[in-house]
Every structure is written in C-alpha cells, then in structure tokens.
C-alpha cells in the first residue's frame, strides 16, 4: 500500500544491527548483519494527505531469537501492551509512559539489574530514582500526525500532562538498549 499511496519516506529510516541497534536513532545504516544479531528497523512513509507513519520492529537476523533475546523482546512487548492499555480518553499522555516503564522496571528488578536495595517503586521515583533510564533512555510515546513527532515543540507541561481525547494518534514504543 505504501508503495502505491505513499508520498515518500516520512523520516530517515533507522536500520541497525548488533551493537549499532543499541545506539538510539542510528541513521548511518552501516554495518554487517551477523548471525545471532538483532535487527532494529524504524521506518515510516508519508502518505498523500501528508500524515506520517512510524513503525519500529526488532527481528532476529537469522530468524530465531536466542533465549536471552526472547526474554528481553517479551519484556519490551509486555511494556508496549501495558502502554497501549493505558491509551484511553481522559488519561494523561504521561500515563502511557508510566504504564510501560513500570513493566520495564519490574523486569529489570526481576533480572537483578537495578542497584542493590532498589525496588521497583524507588526505581520509578522521578526525583530520586529513574534507575531504569540506563537501559531505556527515551520516552515511550509521541504524537503522530503531520510530523512524525507531532507536537514535539509543545511546552513539556502541556504535552506530557495533556489529556488524551478521541482522534489523537500516538505511538507506544518502549525499548531496552
């Protein structure tokens, strides 16, 4: 459909494998695809109406996840599902991130990756915690519309604290790097 209806690419595609996939927004798109690596694809098309799509997927280069890769993939997928469940009229934009990042923090805690003595609540504390940010250095969502990061220039308090209303389109893109 995109080939026939698309206006062009919506933004520079991100295609990264191996260690490059750990670099947020790797747009050099260089490097080898090696057996056992994961491939991160982040691409979108701008349609004739000038709206832009944003799709991110992580795939095993050889077609099979290792056990460790599957464990992390499933955690990120669960975080995405939690974020999607939080998208509803009346919720705050930040509720989507909060739901997804809680799942990320719970997994990091279960895996023993949070500092000793740090529980999930402490990890999520916005003033004294944020321990999960070592592995997820970005927000979970952004509005999607005429720009791939629609409303990106809005004041932070108006954007993150904004109430979701019918008709809004947003992404839910948690990750672990």
Residue ranges: model-predicted function:
Residues 1-177:
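Active-site neighborhoods and metal-handling regions in enzymes and metal-associated proteins
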């Amino acid at each position: 459909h995109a080939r026939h209806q698309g206006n062009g690419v919506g933004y520079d595609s991100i295609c990264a494998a191996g260690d490059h996939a750990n670099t947020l927004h790797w747009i050099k798109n260089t490097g080898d695809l090696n057996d056992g690596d994961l491939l991160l694809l982040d691409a979108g098309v701008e349609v004739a109406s000038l709206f832009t799509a944003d799709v991110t997927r992580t795939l095993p280069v050889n077609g099979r996840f290792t056990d460790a890769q599957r464990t992390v993939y499933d955690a990120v997928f669960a975080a995405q599902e939690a974020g999607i469940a939080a998208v509803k009229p009346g919720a705050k934009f930040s509720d989507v991130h909060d739901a997804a990042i809680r799942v990320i923090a719970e997994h990091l805690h279960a895996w023993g990756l949070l500092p000793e003595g740090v529980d999930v609540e402490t990890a999520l504390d916005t003033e004294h915690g944020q321990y999960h940010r070592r592995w997820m250095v970005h927000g979970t969502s952004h509005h999607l519309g005429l720009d791939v990061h629609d409303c990106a220039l809005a004041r932070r308090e108006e954007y993150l604290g904004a109430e979701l209303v019918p008709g809004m389109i947003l992404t839910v893109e948690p990750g672990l790097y």
